């Protein structure tokens, strides 16, 4: 998808803007609320979320990989969560932050996200969290940037969009 067809601004006022984000699974009006759904345990079924009016959801590719594996590749993320709108997947950065590591490389995670045909994918990052030295936090950000560049270099033109993870941290 070309950059000029990815996002269109329909109205702007001062620093704000309203627009339409285009994906392989439809249009998303922005700004948008984006519900997070668990790929295994859905309290509210994804179909119901679509009926309510949400055009985009976010789910976790790492959990999808661990619980569904090859089935997710065969069915795609839309089939796994039973949702026909746009889907964004996070690659497991929170799990890295929470548990210290995940048992998949960033490159393998990116390949998985490609294969499950998520509309918007986020490369596996190394979150900075809180309490790291400035040097350590910088090394985590540098590692994330390196992975993001490699992911983009290896991406294919299939309409899938890659988004950079937001890094926190307490240092300037």
Regions found by a protein language model. Give the residues of each.
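Non-catalytic, usually N-terminal nucleic-acid engagement modules in DNA/RNA processing proteins
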Residues: 1-156
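Eukaryote-skewed repeat-based solenoidal scaffolds used as protein-protein interaction platforms
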Residues: 148, 155-157, 162-172
């Amino acid at each position: 998808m070309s950059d000029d067809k990815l996002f269109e601004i329909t109205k702007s006022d001062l620093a704000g803007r309203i627009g339409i984000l285009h994906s392989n699974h439809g249009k998303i009006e922005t700004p948008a609320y984006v519900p997070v759904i668990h790929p295994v345990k859905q309290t509210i079924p994804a179909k119901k979320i679509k009926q309510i009016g949400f055009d985009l959801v976010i789910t976790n590719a790492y959990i999808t990989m661990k619980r569904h594996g090859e089935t997710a590749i065969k069915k795609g993320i839309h089939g796994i969560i039973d949702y026909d709108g746009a889907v964004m997947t996070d690659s497991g950065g929170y799990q890295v932050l929470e548990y210290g590591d995940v048992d998949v490389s960033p490159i393998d995670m990116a390949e998985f996200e490609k294969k499950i045909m998520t509309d918007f994918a986020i490369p596996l990052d190394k979150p900075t969290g809180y309490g790291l030295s400035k040097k350590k936090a910088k090394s985590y950000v540098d590692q994330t940037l390196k992975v993001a560049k490699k992911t983009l270099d290896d991406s294919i033109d299939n309409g899938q969009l890659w988004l950079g993870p937001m890094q926190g941290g307490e240092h300037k």
